[in-house]
Every structure is written in structure tokens, then in C-alpha cells.
A protein has these predicted regions:
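N-terminal active-site segment of His-dependent metallophosphoesterases
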Residues: 1-79
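Proteins with a high burden of low-complexity, intrinsically disordered sequence enriched in S/T/G/P/A and R
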Residues: 35, 177-178
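Short beta-strand segments at enzyme active-site cores
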Residues: 63-67, 97-98, 178
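Extended active-site neighborhood of metal-dependent phosphoesterases/phosphodiesterases
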Residues: 80-176
Length: 178
């Protein structure tokens, strides 16, 4: 039985407008907004992301996984735009998301930030807001979502899996017979 999984990441949807930077003020957002404006704007082009989406949907995959960096500076406006874009791939049972470091660029309110994506970031039968790692079973495939995205200081961008997630992952893998 075949299973087609479409996987992609790092679309960094733009543009990053001044209102994204100043209406949701953090010093790191100013630095990131300027970086986007003067360096990254030519790298992260929405028409490329839209072309990727069209190509993925034309392949009619069994499931779609997006693994981070939907946005640039984690502003409320970016998250709202990103949610609409991600929804255009399909309903949450058919689309899985885990955040990347730019999705956790700064500490942000869950309900107006990553919380908007809860339905895409939870396991089968789970309604928890913070359910990493989560497991989604799709036919003969287990999709396991981990979250290494943590807000970092001004000049840093990275991530880590804490001991709690690693222990939970080990338990989930045992439950799956792996």
C-alpha cells in the first residue's frame, strides 16, 4: 500500500510590513524586519510559496507536512496570514505542522501566535494546546510532531528538544512498537 507524503518547510511568507514590526513591538522584530526588508525579501517570495502549494496540491498527496518557518518575525499579522495560507492546503486532519525557529522568533501570546495552528499541531484524538510530541497515524505511517522552536535572544536563532519531549517521544515510540 503506497502512501504519498508531501513535506516542505521554510516558506517565510511575507511581506514583513512596518505595521508587523511596530504594532507588535519587540526589539528583535525590528532587527528581523530590517533584515527581511534589506536582505531576505528577495529570497522569500510569496509567489514561489504559492507555486510550491500549487505543485503539491496537483500531486494529490495522502498527507502534507509543513515543518517550520511559515513566518519571519512571529507577529500577530504574520500568523493570521500564515494560517489562511496553511488552510489552503486542506483541513487539519490532512495537514500537519510543527513550528520552526522563526515561528517562535520571540515570545508571543499563544492564542494570537502559534495557538492559531493548534488543529494542525495535535495528535489523533488530542485537543491539548501543548501536546508535543504528538502522533498522527495515517494508514501505515506514523507522523510524529516534535517542537524544537523556542524563543531566543536578539542575535540567536535555533532550537532544542527538552528532556520532557525526549522522554515523551521514547514513550510514544514504544507505544507504536518501534
Amino acid at each position: 500500500m503506497s502512501f504519498t507524503l508531501a513535506h516542505f518547510s521554510d516558506v517565510h511568507l511575507g511581506p514583513v510590513g512596518l505595521s508587523d514590526v511596530f504594532n507588535d513591538f519587540r526589539l528583535k522584530r525590528i532587527v528581523g524586519g530590517l533584515s527581511w526588508r534589506f536582505r531576505r525579501r528577495g529570497l522569500h517570495i510569496n509567489s514561489h510559496a504559492d507555486g510550491l502549494r500549487a505543485d503539491i496540491l496537483a500531486q494529490v498527496p495522502d498527507h502534507i507536512c509543513f515543518t517550520g518557518d511559515l513566518v519571519n518575525i512571529a507577529s500577530k499579522a504574520e500568523f493570521r496570514r500564515g494560517l489562511e495560507w496553511l488552510k489552503s492546503f486542506g483541513e487539519p486532519p490532512a495537514v500537519t505542522m510543527v513550528p520552526g525557529n522563526h515561528d517562535a522568533y520571540v515570545k508571543a501570546a499563544h492564542e494570537t501566535g502559534l495557538g492559531l495552528f493548534n488543529a494542525f499541531m495535535q495528535g489523533d484524538g488530542s485537543a491539548s494546546d501543548h501536546a508535543f510530541p504528538f502522533v498522527r497515524l495515517r494508514r501505515n505511517v506514523a507522523i510524529i510532531g516534535l517542537n524544537s522552536a523556542v524563543p531566543q535572544s536578539l542575535r540567536k536563532a535555533g532550537g532544542t528538544l527538552g528532556p520532557q519531549q525526549r522522554v515523551a517521544l521514547e514513550m510514544r515510540l514504544k507505544d507504536l512498537g518501534a
